[in-house]
Amino acid sequence: MNDTISWSTLAVILAAGQGTRMRSPLPKVMHPVGNRPLLGHVLAAVEAAGIEQVAVVLGAGGPMVADYLHQAAPSARLFTQHEQLGTAHALLAARGALQAHEQGCVLVLFGDSPLITSQTLSRLRQALIDGAAVAVAGFHSGQPGPYGRLLVEDGHLRAIREAKDASAEELQVSFCNGGVMGLRADSCLWLLERIGKQNAQGEYYLTDVVAVANSAGLPVTAVEVEEDDVRGVNDREQLLAAERIYRQRQANL
């Protein structure tokens, strides 16, 4: 096994979402949990994991978020997704950072997931070091209803099946897609450029990278994490839930 230290890691944080369900003029990733913006918690986890290379993809509210990043993460490279064409499209907006990072690991995070931990990031990175080309964070849920399912066979992640596309048998699977993932830098761009938009929304979905990698015969794995680690914030109710979990964690320190 290679030494973790020898694997340079780039964290790309997707923070371009419009956050319309927040019903607020404040950019979604700037809403606070524990007196810190959602994005600030993600940056803290990245720093705690020892990741020094950071790129952030901005969209709606870009100037305000950029001002915050200039203070909170002055070394981060900033990119803009000018059109909302899906998560893979957002990641490709950071092409400049991806091209400069030819070896090691690329971790893809979301700016609205304030409960992500450095341990989860380290485990995704380790999965890549251990040989996976793609590693996807997954969690077991007692109520998996709307979540995409991770279909694992003999230790390999074969597919991410969205709930609306899943068979009755697949809907019984409780292992769900956490969204956060890692990709080997040496195949990252090759995989992303082969993602199409043949779907109802006409968007480029990052989850399709699993199918592309499997078709190319590259190893794909799932890394089990706690559901709270990958819990996103899309509305006021979820913001309050994240605040409660954050306070519980702080009380348990």
Model-derived features: positions:
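Glycine-rich N-terminal loop/short-helix segment of MobA-like nucleotidyltransferase
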Residues: W7-V33, A49, A72
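Short N-terminal binding/cap micro-motifs at the start of the first secondary-structure element
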Residues: G19-R23, M64, G145
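Conserved core of the sugar-phosphate nucleotidyltransferase
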Residues: I116-A200, T207, L218-T221
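Conserved N-terminal catalytic core of the sugar/cofactor nucleotidyltransferase
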Residues: M1-L10, P37-L109, L115-Q126
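Hydrophobic packing residues within well-ordered alpha-helices of enzyme cores
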Residues: M22, V65-L69, L124, L192, ...
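Conserved alpha/beta core of the MobA/IspD/sugar-nucleotide pyrophosphorylase nucleotidyltransferase superfamily
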Residues: N2-W7, S174-L253
